[in-house]
Structures are given as C-alpha cells and as structure tokens.
C-alpha cells in the first residue's frame, strides 16, 4: 500500500475537482496516511512487542461519506493495528468500515463504507503474501 501522495492533499485544498476525480478513478483505493509505533510505547511500560498502528484511507472516498454526514470524519481515515501476538504471529485488527460508518444510519455513507470493506480486505490479503 503506498503512502498518501502529498500532492493529492494540495489538490483537495485547492479545490481542483477535476484532478480529484481523476485521482479517484486512477489512484490507489487506499493509502497510508500515518504509521505509529505502539510497540515503542509498550516498551516504555516494560512490555516490548511489535505493534504498529496504520491510518489508511482515501481522502476522495472520505469526501463521498462526509458530504452526507460530516461526523463520518471522526472515523476516516481507517485505523488498522498490526501486532505480534503472544505466540509470535502477526495479527491485523480493525473495525469493519461498514459497521463503523453504518452507525450513522445513512445508506449513502454505508454504501461507500461497503466499498471500503472490500478495498481493505484486498489490501490486507496482499500484505500477507
């Protein structure tokens, strides 16, 4: 999964709708916005382990939800934790987007979130290969 293209952020800030729509059609379904090393935080508490929190999403896709329910911005980007479990295996954990965004009771938002379910599942499967 690629890092979020910083030029896309500028495109959105500038209101370049044509370029944003092109990005929606041709760009990656999901990008990494930020990575936080929670394992380092655990090490401070004497519980060292591998644990990364990824914030991933697509700003254009997020806008398709927030235009109907601005409070959907509370949950975009999506957060995925990749951590080492007690027996040393890597585990992905996340809230399913359609469930999280479904709380708003707006079918337009939920429909976009179902697309995120599929994109997230594809991305995580690719990451395990």
PLM regions with names:
Residues 80-86:
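Short, low-complexity Ser/Thr-rich regulatory SLiMs
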Residues 1-75, 86-90, 97-129:
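Cytosolic covalent-transfer regions centered on His/Cys nucleophiles
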